């Protein structure tokens, strides 16, 4: 029948719970940007901690030499609030800026949890002298249907507008150098990287696109048609949302990264993009992993990819 909602956990950060079958107790795992996950057993009547089941000693962010990112509320292109995280390098700005992007539905990246602090790629880039920005644009998860529905029938449009708006805000604060802005992402984030370079070349100068969706008519229909309907019903949306439609806009540096046995975003997407870039006489760089799937899993491949990504930004934004 429902009733008054009562908060049972008070620790800052994100909590995930599993309730016992009898409803008397629950297991709570929580973390924040300042500390790693702690797992406790609690009573549902008041939230009292019965026992601490797991806690990593000495895992505070400062003990690991990590600087937790700064959480902030930013404005989307239409003025509504969106959440961002900023990893600051040492020294005063303006700094070269690298945007870490996903941007698609079903995901919320900016949370007060340990995973945000131990994003080692973002931390590595910050230690190399880059300001790193992550933003959950309109269309991302856990903000309600209206927030998600902004991308209905128009993927690849408002998400880019919001990332541009976020960049403009950190530039206006004097934190970022507008002439040295890069972007990277994987899967939908790879798609966003390509679309940002091509639809906003005056903002984004360098991008690393991992396993990018290139044309929505070549991706999982159960996912795509939920947001875009069918190509027959929404031809304009599919055309405007295709990376291949916008290749003429590319003027910056683009590194494509893809595994050739990717079962999620098939390699045909990158192959299509290469064909379109060649036809438009647009230069690009590419890193192929012949035996990898949606992203490298082999330790050597992971290390190689991370070194290549960082060196690409260093070459084109720090030099």
Predicted regions and their residues:
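Blade-edge beta-strand/turn elements of extracellular beta-propeller
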Residues: 3-10
């Amino acid at each position: 029948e429902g009733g008054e909602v009562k908060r049972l956990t008070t620790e800052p950060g994100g909590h995930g719970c599993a309730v016992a079958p009898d409803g008397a107790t629950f297991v709570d795992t929580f973390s924040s940007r300042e500390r790693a996950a702690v797992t406790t057993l609690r009573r549902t009547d008041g939230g009292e901690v019965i026992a601490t089941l797991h806690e990593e000693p000495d895992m505070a962010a400062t003990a690991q030499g990590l600087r937790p990112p700064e959480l902030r509320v930013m404005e989307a292109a239409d003025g509504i609030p969106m959440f961002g995280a900023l990893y600051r390098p040492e020294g005063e700005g303006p700094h070269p800026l690298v945007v870490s992007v996903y941007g698609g539905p079903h995901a919320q990246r900016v949370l007060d949890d340990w995973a945000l602090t131990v994003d080692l790629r973002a931390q590595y880039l910050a230690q190399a002298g880059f300001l790193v920005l992550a933003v959950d644009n309109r269309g991302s998860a856990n903000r309600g249907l209206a927030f998600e529905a902004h991308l209905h029938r128009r993927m690849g449009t408002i998400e880019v507008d919001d990332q541009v708006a976020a960049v403009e805000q950190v530039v206006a604060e004097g934190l970022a150098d507008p002439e040295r802005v890069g972007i990277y992402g994987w899967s939908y984030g790879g798609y966003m990287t390509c679309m940002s370079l091509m639809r906003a070349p005056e903002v984004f100068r360098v991008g690393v696109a991992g396993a990018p969706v290139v044309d929505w008519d070549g991706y999982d229909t159960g996912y795509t048609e939920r947001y875009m309907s069918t190509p027959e019903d929404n031809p304009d949306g599919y055309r405007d949302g295709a990376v291949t439609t916008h290749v003429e806009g590319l003027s910056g540096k683009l590194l494509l990264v893809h595994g050739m046995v990717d079962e999620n975003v098939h390699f045909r997407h990158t192959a299509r993009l290469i064909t379109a870039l060649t036809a438009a006489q647009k230069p690009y760089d590419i890193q192929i992993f012949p035996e990898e799937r949606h992203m490298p899993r082999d330790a050597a491949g992971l290390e190689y990819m991370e070194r290549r990504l960082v060196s690409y930004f260093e070459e084109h934004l720090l030099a």
